[in-house]
Amino acid sequence: MSAKDQNPSPSSVELPLSRSVGYQIRTTHRLIQRYLQLRIHPHRVTLGMWYFLRVLWNEDGLTQRELSNRVGAMEPTTLSAILSMENRGLVKRVRDSHDRRKWNIFLTSKGRKLKDLTLPLAADVVNEAVAGFSEQEIDLLLKLLGAIQSNIGARLDEFDTQD
C-alpha cells in the first residue's frame, strides 16, 4: 500500500453530517442547552452562570483558576461570570487567606437556594432527552461518551506535551 493510499487527500474524504460523531454530539449539546436555558430562565439564571453554579454547589470556595479549570472556561470568561453572579447576589469573592493574590468564590444563601429550584429542572431536561431509553442504553451511552472524552483527552495531552 502506498503512502498516498494511507493518507487520502482531503477532497476524497467523505464524512456526511449524519455520520459525524462530533457534529451529532454538538447538535445534541446545543439542543439540550437551549432547552435547559428555557427551563431555568424564569429563575434569572443564564447558561453561563449555570455551569459555574453547578461546580460551586459541589465545591464551594474554589479560586477563580480552579473554577475555570473545573468548568473548562478561560479565566476572563470565568471572571465575567463571577462578576455577573456577584452583582446578582449569588456569589461573593473573598481574598484567599494564604495567598492575597487569589480570590475564593463562595455561594451566598441566594446562590445556594437556586440549586433546589433549578437542579430538578435540569434533571427533567436530561430525563426528557433520554425518554424511551432503557437504563442499559443510558449506561452504554454514558460509557461511550466517556470513551470519546478519554480518547480526545489523550490526544490533547499529546499536544500539550509537545509545546
Task: Describe these PLM feature segments.
Residues 1-13, 136-163:
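C-terminal regulatory/oligomerization modules of transcriptional regulators
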Residues 4, 83-146:
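Charged, amphipathic alpha-helical coiled-coil/dimerization segments
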Residues 10-19, 108:
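A short, mixed-charge helix-start or loop-turn motif at secondary-structure junctions
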Residues 16, 23-26, 30-77, 88, ...:
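N-terminal helix-turn-helix DNA-binding core of bacterial DNA-binding proteins
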Residues 20, 24, 77, 106, ...:
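Alpha-helical initiation/capping and key positions within long helical/coiled-coil segments
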